């Protein structure tokens, strides 16, 4: 029997033991469940079963009924047959130990992205939620960055990519950046005539990305002059802190580097003009402990809204954009496709070997660098990732280096990810690391055949496969959940050249039953074989 995404031992809130045990990656929902009934704590398997398919089906159907669906654009050719029509059984989501919601939850970073599927959070005590925040469903519905009515996407002609904005314009358009008291020391260019002032640690050059919870800049390190990417996150809401800490914990848990995983340099916590370098598990830092407590309790701990607090993540800079931009701006190249397939499978095998489940694999989160002369992929954005720690003997704490942990038997229950890349079992809320294999299959299939759709909110063209059901387009995982016996037509386009080995491997990666999918290590071996034979 595999591990469960289970709560850890109880400890007094606010104490060192509380933070030491709960900073392993548990969300606030999981902490609440750990203080629920003793029966649920004694039997993690029964608790997971209680959140199984029978109790979850109402919610997804209700969510689908509220969505506005769009028709494919003129001339769109998608031969993939959909599942038979008809009304679907209602699915109701239930969360143990649900917290009463007192206000709307803050928005998430990107459209289409779903995060921890827990009960609704209590509103921050000292900071009212922003007025534009999305309301959490009364039944403890999934939180996400979209409106409750998730818009469908339609395959339409490509849209031009957005150009980068200069740093000065970015700061002028970003009120959050303008009001940061310590930013001049941390990340702004040295002012003219300031010969006696301290050299800034990083100088911002241009804004290269923006989301609901942060801004990403291209920057230059003050001492070395190296180009880096700096992600600035305002910690005024527990939702932002939870995402930031999840990414921080995942990247700092890696003991070795991998060329296909984005390199994390450092994290700086800034408050009231002071900057402090953060390290994972630093119990001597009161700011760090309060940050963890903010995430776990779901309420602001760091102070009043007038005292802005920021996290700055410094990572390697990838000048080639993301996988969407790179692939869709170039002519199809089988050699590049093979190289990318090998790099992606190598990266996922490395993460799973280090007990990290990404849970949000998609082309947006795969970056490109060409500094070596050839394109190198970098898996990035670990905000929804999960570090699967082992269950240690009684009286000892879990050890994230436990080599006995098998991520393919570590059961997760938080439905999160981006809908067009989510595996069927993720929609159900009971899955393992095999969900990453499914998402990778969607990405590789779409990359080979250039299958795209347009995000109805951002109007951005995205690589991704889908199923046509009449005039609607449906995520492959959702369609397989409704009809597990549905046959996927790979390749979809008759003109696509694809070897039999790659066809079969993609079908195995996209199997409705996760037990029929290869794990990351088998996938890496098979990918080497089929790409050499192709």
UniProtKB/Swiss-Prot annotation:
Q: Mind naming one GO cellular-component term on file for this protein?
A: cytoplasm
Q: What is this protein called?
A: Serine/threonine-protein kinase 35
Q: Where in the cell is it found?
A: Nucleus; Nucleus, Nucleolus; Cytoplasm
Which keywords has UniProt assigned to this entry?
ATP-binding, Cytoplasm, Kinase, Nucleotide-binding, Nucleus, Phosphoprotein, Serine/threonine-protein kinase, Transferase
In its UniProt entry, the species of origin is given as Homo sapiens
Q: How does it assemble?
A: Interacts with PDLIM1/CLP-36.
- Tissue specificity note: Expressed in testis.
Reply yes or no: does the keyword Glycosyltransferase apply.
Answer: no
């Amino acid at each position: 029997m595999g591990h469960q995404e289970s709560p850890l031992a109880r400890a007094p809130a606010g104490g060192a033991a509380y933070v030491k045990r709960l900073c392993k990656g548990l969300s606030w929902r999981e902490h609440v469940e750990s203080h629920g009934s003793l029966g649920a704590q004694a039997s993690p398997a029964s608790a997971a079963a209680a959140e199984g398919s029978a109790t979850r089906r109402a919610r997804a159907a209700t969510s689908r009924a509220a969505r506005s669906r769009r028709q494919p654009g003129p001339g769109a050719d998608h031969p993939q047959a959909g599942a038979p029509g008809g009304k679907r059984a209602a699915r109701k989501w239930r969360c143990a130990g649900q917290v009463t919601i007192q206000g709307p939850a803050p928005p998430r970073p990107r459209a289409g992205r779903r995060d921890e599927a827990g009960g609704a959070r209590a509103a921050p005590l000292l900071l009212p939620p922003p007025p534009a925040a999305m309301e959490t469903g009364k039944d403890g519905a999934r939180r996400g960055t979209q409106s409750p009515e998730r818009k469908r996407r339609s395959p339409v002609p490509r849209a031009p990519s957005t150009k980068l904005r200069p740093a000065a314009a970015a700061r002028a358009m970003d009120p959050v950046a303008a009001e940061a008291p310590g930013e001049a020391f941390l990340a702004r260019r040295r002012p003219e005539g300031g010969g006696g002032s301290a050299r800034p640690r990083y100088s911002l050059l241009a804004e290269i990305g923006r989301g609901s919870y942060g801004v990403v800049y291209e920057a230059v390190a003050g001492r070395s002059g190296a180009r880096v990417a700096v992600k600035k996150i305002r910690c005024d809401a527990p939702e932002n802190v939870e995402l930031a800490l999840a990414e921080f914990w995942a990247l700092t848990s890696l003991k070795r580097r991998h060329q296909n995983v984005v390199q994390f340099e450092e994290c700086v916590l800034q408050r009231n003009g002071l900057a402090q370098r953060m390290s994972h598990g630093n119990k001597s830092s009161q700011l760090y402990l309060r940050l963890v407590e903010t995430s776990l309790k779901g309420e602001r701990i760091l102070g009043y809204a007038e005292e802005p607090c920021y996290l700055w993540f410094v990572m390697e800079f990838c000048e080639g954009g993301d996988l969407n931009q790179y692939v869709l701006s170039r002519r199809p190249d089988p050699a590049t496709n093979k190289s990318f397939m090998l790099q992606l499978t190598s990266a996922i095998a490395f993460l799973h070997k280090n007990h990290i489940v990404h849970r949000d694999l998609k082309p947006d989160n795969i970056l490109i660098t060409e500094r070596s002369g050839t394109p190198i992929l970098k898996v990035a954005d670990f905000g929804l990732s999960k570090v699967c720690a082992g269950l240690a003997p009684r009286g000892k704490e879990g050890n994230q280096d436990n080599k006995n942990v098998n991520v393919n038997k570590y059961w997760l229950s938080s439905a999160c990810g981006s809908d067009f890349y989510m595996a069927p079992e993720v929609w159900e809320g009971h899955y393992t690391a095999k969900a990453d294999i499914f998402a990778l299959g969607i990405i590789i299939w779409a990359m080979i055949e250039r299958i795209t759709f347009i995000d109805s909110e951002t109007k951005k063209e995205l690589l991704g496969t889908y199923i046509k059901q009449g005039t609607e387009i449906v995520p492959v995982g959702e369609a397989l959940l409704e009809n597990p016996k549905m046959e996927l037509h790979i390749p979809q386009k008759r003109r696509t050249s694809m070897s039999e080995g790659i066809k079969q491997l993609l079908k195995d990666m996209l199997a409705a039953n996760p037990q029929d999918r290869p794990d990351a290590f088998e996938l890496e071996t098979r990918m080497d074989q089929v790409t050499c034979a192709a």
